[in-house]
Amino acid sequence: MGRLLSGFADCICCGRGNRYQSADAWMNQPLNIFQPRSTATLEDLLEKSSRAREAVWQQLGSLEPLVLSHLVSPTLSGGPKWPALRQAFRLVRRPNGNVILASDGLSDPFDDITLGDGNVNGFGLEFYIETPGNEIAETIHDVKKSWQFQLLYTVSQLAAGHGGIRAIMDDMKLLSTEAEGVNEAIAEEHRKALVNGAGRVGALLGLQSPQDSSSASADKEADSTGVPERIPDMPLTEVKLVNIKLLTLAELKLITDRGAEGRKRLSELFAGPERLVSSLHRPSAV
């Protein structure tokens, strides 16, 4: 995980000159940077945050009632701490046949601030990956073994370990990373096109539905195929929904060679209704 965190920091800074000599500088910002205002109890805020997230997913499809979580939080065994300790994931089956896997807890209020006054909605984001339904298992148990879940889990842990990803995303719009621990879940016949020599896969973070760039209202941003950019009605601070897009090695090389310009170019190349979808079977955009 240490190598992954270092690689992520290097990746998000590429193409920006000396402005981002250390991505960790963002972590020195005060917790109440968004100037929240609330005197609700932590329990109230956790419940309101959970309901707001559920409302978004229910708008996009059929939300599985069973939450994907751990019997024992990875935090207790030395993993990154999520805002309220709880680490969970949700599964949504969409009318178009796709499936969404999403983190559920990165935007919980911090549990070490008992009152809402001065608290924020965690790291200010939740990640999701959308994939064709025929490329992922049917049962929750098998879903947790899928490459889609492993990629989502790795990126979520990465963000929790860093702590300041939201501020960087607000400034840079698109980030990219190379994720470990995903390659073994990918069918062997697809690894040559997706897994690099270090055993990692590339991912682009932050693609939005085409209508998001021009829509002023979060609750109008989702349509039959799109996912909203933000979660409405969070109790403390704004929370973004961040797409994870699996990259081919050729696409990852474009980013490695050209940095921020490469990420922007890929965003332009990923068009149409499959823009946000990750699949082992799609042709490379480059």
Residue ranges with predicted function:
Residues 2-10:
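Short hydrophobic helices that act as membrane-entry/anchoring signals
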Residues 4, 17-20, 276:
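Positively charged, low-complexity intrinsically disordered regions
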Residues 10, 14-84:
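The feature captures two recurrent sequence modes
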Residues 12-15, 159, 273:
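Short, flexible helical or helix-coil boundary motifs
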Residues 30-46, 126-142, 251:
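Charged, low-complexity surface segments at secondary-structure and domain boundaries
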Residues 40, 44-47, 51, 146, ...:
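Alpha-helix boundary/N-cap detector
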Residues 62, 78-131, 167-284:
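Aromatic/basic-lined ligand-recognition segments
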Residues 132-166:
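Compact, glycine/acidic-enriched structural inserts
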